[in-house]
């Protein structure tokens, strides 16, 4: 009798473990899709400085080694862009971190935070960077051709 109970408990444990694993995979797939959707909202953003360009075209041409990612915090879904910009005048390469809070219902985003070499930028500094990126963007150049 003890052997049957033990086998039954092992089967129950295996079934519970399988359910937990499947649940984890489903959550992981959902998280990945939400992350990709949020990134696309920001990448497809437009700006009146150059209405033909998308945000990803402008930023990926203006900065080098750009990396787009997404995460969730208490405020919501954040899209993070990290990239570098060489300034020949001071012989320095700056690292920029741009974070945008995404409103998935309205397919919009707003500045969440921005940093230049780890120093917090204000909204005006981020806007200047965005204006320069869009102004210099050539919509006929793909990111891998820059």
Report each predicted region and the residues it spans.
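Hydrophobic membrane-insertion alpha-helices, especially the h-region
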Residues: 11-25
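Cystatin/cathelin-like cysteine-protease inhibitor module
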Residues: 5-9, 24-146
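N-terminal hydrophobic targeting signals that begin at the initiator methionine
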Residues: 1-2
């Amino acid at each position: 009798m003890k052997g049957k109970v033990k086998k039954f408990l092992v089967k129950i444990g295996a079934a519970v473990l399988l359910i937990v694993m499947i649940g984890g995979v489903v959550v992981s797939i959902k998280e990945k899709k939400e992350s990709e959707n949020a990134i696309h909202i920001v990448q497809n953003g437009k700006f009146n400085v150059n209405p033909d360009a998308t945000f990803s075209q402008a930023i990926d041409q203006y900065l080098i080694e750009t990396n787009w990612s997404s995460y969730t915090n208490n405020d919501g879904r954040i899209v993070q862009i990290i990239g570098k910009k060489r300034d020949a005048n001071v012989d320095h390469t700056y690292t920029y971190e741009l974070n945008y809070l995404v409103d998935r219902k309205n397919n919009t985003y707003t500045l969440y935070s921005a940093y230049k070499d780890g120093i917090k930028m204000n909204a005006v500094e981020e806007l200047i960077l965005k204006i320069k990126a869009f102004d210099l963007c050539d919509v006929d150049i793909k990111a891998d051709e820059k």
